[in-house]
């Protein structure tokens, strides 16, 4: 399980909350910390790690409506009750100019829950009667990743499934709120990210877990990576899937959230 703290919340207070939770008797015998590193922002920036990690979401933030697949357009129309072709759907970067806002102001636009949807991992927010912004959070997120911002990355070894690990995440969230490190009405991903599926776990590890030689960890050293290799996949086919999760028309990462290794592999091979 890969966990990393976002640059704006990375610090000893947040780390302490996580460590306290995993020392709790409920989790102490079930979850082992096997990797901890503070990855320098300059290291990530020089290698284009963040851009690659978020490349699908950045593409939608730049292209807006043009990036939507037919299935995504149908989901949009059903949810918002507006024909996709009649709606003004723009990427976040175009929205900055249209609305005259900076990155943080765009990110902080509040809307009711019925004006916000996650479609294949892309966040769509209705900000006015017929203006919809795709991945409104990406410009702000990218500005927070710079040479002077670090990311704390952790790998936990566990036999718990993703669903079984979720209560630990809920406990961390409650502790963060109690410590004043997270607003009660905000989700935990404002502070930290955790891998919620096998393919997402590979993506996270490939971006934020490194060897002592400052090289990405080998796929064979990751549980799901080893599983795929044992199934006959090659490093090339695995990396191709990580780099282009929409090759099947669906987002491989979101399609396999909370999946088992076998289930995630079956979805990948069903393409």
Predicted regions and their residues:
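Non-catalytic terminal and connector segments of soluble metabolic enzymes
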Residues: 1-271
